[in-house]
């Protein structure tokens, strides 16, 4: 684990294409980090319907928390039986967001829901919000920060559980012959992951707490803070920490980490309780004596966890399937934006020329009409 201020900007590369190509064949120049975010393409009615909040979010006395589910999950599976009751007990306002195709569609589309959620919660609360996300849900907010800069000043803590920040090596095998668009995008060699981490991984003003487990069988590798979930550089204040560094005997896997693990819970609550990211040394060893986080009803736990597992399985069975990664959106790459601006400039010039020709034709008709009268 390392808690530190990290800064630095990665080098740029040459753009050759705006659409999906193999990373080895062509390099890409990404949009600058200060490029204003694009307009959202998802209908506002769908964005609004996706966000469910407690009433205390409006004018909140403390930072409300946005709960973002992982791939194959909805808030019902990820949070309804664990994190939502836990936050209620602590008096922390929260919202959860339901993403298209059970968080298995194009992650770039899902990111628009996150952008809307951040903006909506910030406006309602009148203050910065915090985010807790599992797996893809831990990575998604970073796409929002990267390509919608206005969201950066709206977020205090960004907390990821087993976040797929650098993709996973397992996607190569899971996606043979095909898999969901989101799974394709979360391959460690995908264009999406390269774009996500382009130029800088974090941004000043946001505290990043990235919690991972050495027993993660989905997001790999995650043996130390050079693994997939950890983030580095860019100016954000960062804690990358394995639950085993706090509780060495904790054997939670990928799913347990983001839904029920007590060590992960303690680290997240510590992060929410003071400025900056989690400080692992603040977590008492007594946390290690109970594997289940507060908020879980131990009487109904067997039924709750079974229901969640069935829900994940049913969602994954309904997942759309593709053999290729969705192409990067135009706003991601610099030359695509430049090409679009050039095309739009030409279109404006053509319209102006047409208006000029129409005006000239009108003048000629007027002169002809005057000659006939005389």
Indicate residue ranges for each PLM-predicted region.
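Serine-dependent carboxylesterase/thioesterase catalytic core
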Residues: 69, 108-202, 218
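Secretory targeting and sorting signals
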Residues: 1-26
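Sequence contexts marking disulfide-bonded cysteines in secreted/extracellular proteins
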Residues: 52-54, 174-180, 246-248, 287-289, ...
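C-terminal catalytic-base region of ester-bond hydrolases, centering on the histidine
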Residues: 204-342
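Secretory pathway export signals and precursors
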Residues: 14, 49, 91, 171, ...
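Polybasic, low-complexity, intrinsically disordered segments
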Residues: 340-374
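Active-site catalytic motif of lipid deacylating hydrolases and related acyltransferases
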Residues: 28-44, 52-128, 299-326, 333-341
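Loop/turn elements at helix/coil->beta-strand transitions in domains of secreted/extracellular proteins
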Residues: 61-64, 90-95, 124-129, 151-157, ...
């Amino acid at each position: 684990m390392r808690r530190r201020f990290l800064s630095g900007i990665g080098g740029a590369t040459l753009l050759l294409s705006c659409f999906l190509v193999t990373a080895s064949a062509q390099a890409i120049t990404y949009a600058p980090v200060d490029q204003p975010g694009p307009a959202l393409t998802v209908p506002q009615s769908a964005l609004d319907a996706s966000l469910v909040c407690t009433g205390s979010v409006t004018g909140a006395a403390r930072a409300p928390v946005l709960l973002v589910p992982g791939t194959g999950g909805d808030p019902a599976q990820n949070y309804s039986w664990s994190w939502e009751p836990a936050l209620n007990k602590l008096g922390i306002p929260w919202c959860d967001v339901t993403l298209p195709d059970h968080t298995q569609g194009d992650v770039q589309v899902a990111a628009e829901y996150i952008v809307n959620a951040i903006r909506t919660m910030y406006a309602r609360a009148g203050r910065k919000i915090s985010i807790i996300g599992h797996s893809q849900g831990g990575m998604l907010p970073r796409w929002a920060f990267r390509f919608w800069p206005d969201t950066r000043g709206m977020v205090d803590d960004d907390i990821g559980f087993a976040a797929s920040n650098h993709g996973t090596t397992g996607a190569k095998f899971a996606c043979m012959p095909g898999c969901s668009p989101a799974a394709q995008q979360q391959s460690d060699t995908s264009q999406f992951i390269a774009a996500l981490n382009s130029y800088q991984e974090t941004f000043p003003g946001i505290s990043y707490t990235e919690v991972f487990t050495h027993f993660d069988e989905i997001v790999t590798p995650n043996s130390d803070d050079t693994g997939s979930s950890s983030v580095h550089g860019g100016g954000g204040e960062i804690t990358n920490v394995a639950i085993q560094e706090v509780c060495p005997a904790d054997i939670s896997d990928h799913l347990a980490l983001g839904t029920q693990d007590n060590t992960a819970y303690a680290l997240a609550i510590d992060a929410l309780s003071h400025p900056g990211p989690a400080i692992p040394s603040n977590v008492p060893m007594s946390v290690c004596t109970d594997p289940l986080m507060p908020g879980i009803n131990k009487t109904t736990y067997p039924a709750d966890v079974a229901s969640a597992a069935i829900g994940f399985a049913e969602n994954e069975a309904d997942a759309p399937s593709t053999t290729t990664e969705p192409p990067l959106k135009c706003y991601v790459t610099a030359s695509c934006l430049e090409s679009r601006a050039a095309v739009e400039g030409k279109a404006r010039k053509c319209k102006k020329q047409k208006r000029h020709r129409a005006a000239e034709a009108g003048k000629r008709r007027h002169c002809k009409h005057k000659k006939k009268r005389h």
